[in-house]
Amino acid sequence: RQAALNLNINLKLYGADMAGTAPALVYCDYTRKVCSMHDKEYIQQLIDICVADKIDVLIPTIDTDLLILSKNTEKFDKVGTKVLISKSDKILICRDKNNTGEFFESCGLKAPRTYNNYKNYPGPYPCFIKPKDGSSSTNAFKVENGEELAVYAGQISEYIIQPFVSGREFTIDIFCDFEGNPIFITPRERVQVRAGEVLKTMICMDKVMI
């Protein structure tokens, strides 16, 4: 919003939510209700909103919505709405942590080895188990021994197991244009985290990460 003011652009923000209670809606000029992303009418409801409100750009804010939106970008294009989103193959790399690990290896980056069956995990402990497509640290557990691992594995349908790695953690925000070219890159240290969400962060313009 501040950028639009600086550029003298007339900007109106619309927000959509299932319950109409999402905290971010307070920053929107107008709000709309939509069904669950799992509902077969989800995409059509969003398209109807985009048509009625003449939405220029749709910006997803929840990672669970990314794949379905990416697969339907052409439908939004037809009504004049651009979805600010990556291609489906890139989203699949990020959403499935098995694919993420394989991608890191293909780039020559170090990453903890991933296991999909607790019976095959050789150690060491502690280790970490979490859903392969999870978010917000839901059903993510630090495990101290094999007995604990078996218990947690029984509670998660599709999981990954990795050796526990401690250290400083960074997120790198990359703002790109519609062709995927980086406009600005901002590394930041996750100083304090709760339920997978950052409470306190510190920008660190490190040239190696950039």
Residue ranges and their predicted role:
Residues 141-210:
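Phosphate-binding site of ATP-dependent enzymes
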Residues 81, 88-114:
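Glycine-/Pro-rich loop/turn segments that contact NAD(P) or position catalytic residues
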Residues 104, 112-114, 121-139, 157-167, ...:
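ATP-grasp fold ATP-binding core
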Residues 1-84:
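ATP-binding N-terminal substructure of ATP-dependent carboxylate-amine bond-forming enzymes
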Residues 22-28, 119-124, 151-155:
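Short loop/helix-cap segments at secondary-structure boundaries that form the rim of catalytic
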Residues 25, 42-44, 86, 92-96, ...:
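Short, charged, surface-exposed secondary-structure boundary motifs
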Residues 62, 96-97, 145:
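Helix N-cap/beta->alpha junction signal
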Residues 12-17, 113-116, 127-128, 141-143:
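Short, hydrophobic beta-strand segments that form beta-sheet elements in well-ordered domains
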